[in-house]
């Protein structure tokens, strides 16, 4: 029973995050700055947003994503 509840929670969480990310992408597509990381939800520092306009990931998540790409490349 616990496994079913865990799976339902996981699916619900995934659907929620997908919806949130779609909204963030629409906002970003209209030139409104994204202040929160799309992966973890932490704030993206202003200096990073100025240096990399349109950035959607914080430094930590960007580094993680780049490591994953190297690992699978």
From Swiss-Prot:
One example GO MF annotation: zinc ion binding
Keywords carried by this UniProt record: Metal-binding, Plasmid, Zinc, Zinc-finger
Disulfide bonding pattern of the chain: none
Zinc finger (dksA C4-type): 37-61
InterPro entries attached to this UniProt entry: Znf_C4-type_bac, Znf_C4_TraR, Znf_DskA_TraR, Znf_DskA_TraR_CS
Top-level taxon of origin: Bacteria
Short name of any one Pfam family annotated for the protein: zf-dskA_traR
PANTHER family: DNAK SUPPRESSOR PROTEIN, FELS-2 PROPHAGE PROTEIN
NCBIfam families assigned: C4_traR_proteo (TIGR02419), PRK13715.1 (NF010268)
This protein's name: Protein TraR
Organism per entry: Escherichia coli (strain K12)
């Amino acid at each position: 029973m616990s496994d079913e509840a865990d799976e339902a929670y996981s699916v619900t969480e995934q659907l929620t995050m997908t919806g949130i990310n779609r909204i963030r992408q629409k906002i970003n597509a209209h030139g409104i700055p994204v202040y929160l990381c799309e992966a973890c939800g932490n704030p993206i520092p202003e200096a990073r947003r100025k240096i990399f306009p349109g950035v959607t990931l914080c430094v930590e998540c960007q580094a993680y994503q780049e490591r994953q790409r190297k690992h699978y490349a």
